[in-house]
Amino acid sequence: PPRTAPPCQPSADSAPLASTPLPVRPSYKPGELVDYTAQDGDTLPALAARFNTSIEEIFAANPIIPRDATTMPPGLPMKIPIYYRALWGSPYRILPDHAFVNGPTLIGFNTTAFVNAHDGWLKTYRTYAGDAWRSGPELVDYIATNFSISPRLLLAVLEYQGGALSQPKPPVDKYLLGQRRIYYESVYLQLVWAANTLNNGYYGWRSGNLLEFELTDGTLTRPDPWQNAASAALQYYFAQISSGGVFQANTGPEGLIRTYTDLFGDP
């Protein structure tokens, strides 16, 4: 059966650090040129913000880039002048971008059939959402469609935090995914909050507007400048509900991604 982690807690002491050491970056001199391969959706303003440099310096280091260019073609090898900022996170990538969005990689995936093949509480769950009664799998598809997020990712989150595919009953805590806002006790609104938070992280990182955020204990973290949008989004999501060792475990190789790969294989 899929591995289910204990529900994510804001305490920094209630979960162990991931057993696999995370990679770290070397130290860089101010303005040192580093190698970077353009990712889907990368723009020069976003890259300048992430690497703490300027668009002009990127142009100077990459004469091949036309002056009127904004969005970079994915796969373009680049040199970027980097200026160190404190608290940059690990370069470990949690999830590739193609596994985050509700896109072509999901052709042929049937959420209802997948959920019904498991013994968890989600397959018998029903709720009223979007002017209709929906089963658990239908709820996942409804939110996946509305937020353009992979239903596989939503299922992995529900399993990791709530045992939705492996446990016969939901956790006693009604705030299933950790959002303790008033009136957010339902699975529906918890999942809406999760999808919205993930999207804010994904598109905020891609645009260059989200460069840092606080964990629940007030600790500041900044995603690695090379980081992909899906991994930055998951870091942002878990920052809302955890800190310290719990945050490191949630975003490390033994965290959510372990549950994802147990369910769906290597993304």
Where are these regions (language model features)?
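Surface-exposed patches in mature extracellular/periplasmic domains of secreted proteins
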Residues: 60, 66-69, 151-156, 202-219
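Secretory-pathway/luminal and periplasmic proteins that interact with or process carbohydrate-rich
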Residues: 67-71, 87, 152, 163-171
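Substrate-binding clefts and substrate-entry loops adjacent to catalytic sites
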Residues: 123-128, 163-189
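Non-catalytic cell-wall polysaccharide-engagement segments
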Residues: 180-267
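Primarily a LysM-type cell-wall glycan-binding module
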Residues: 14-56, 76, 82, 105-137
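Short, functionally critical alpha-helical segments immediately adjacent to catalytic or ligand/cofactor-binding
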Residues: 59-62, 75, 138-165, 194-195
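Ser/Thr-rich, Proline-interspersed low-complexity disordered segments
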Residues: 1-31, 83-92, 97-99
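Short acidic, glycine/serine/threonine-rich helix-capping segments at coil-helix boundaries
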Residues: 39-42, 59-74
